[in-house]
Amino acid sequence: MSRLLKLGQNIKHYRKLKNLSQNELAEIVNFSREHLTCVETGKEYTSLRKLFLIADTLEISVKQLVDFD
């Protein structure tokens, strides 16, 4: 499994733990829902700045998002 796909799966996992829809998270971090879908499915990259915003919104560390073990 690629690291990009694992990152996306981690975002999706923690988003669901917070009971946030893709639309809700995308709005908070100023993404389109389509871009968030692509990030969560490993089809697109996002910036480090956006990863920090996602982590802050989900109340986790960036390390948790990029933990690939």
Identify the residue ranges that each predicted region occupies.
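A detector for short, charged/polar N-terminal pre-domain segments
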Residues: 1-6
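Short basic helix-loop element that most often maps to the first helix and adjoining turn
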Residues: 9-28, 53
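Conserved hydrophobic/aromatic packing and binding residues within compact polymer-binding modules
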Residues: 11, 25-26, 36-39, 65
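Recognition helix of helix-turn-helix/homeodomain-like DNA-binding domains
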Residues: 30-44
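Short, basic-rich loop-to-helix N-cap that marks the start of a DNA-contacting helix
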Residues: 43-53
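Short C-terminal boundary/hinge segments that cap the last helix of small helical domains
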Residues: 59-69
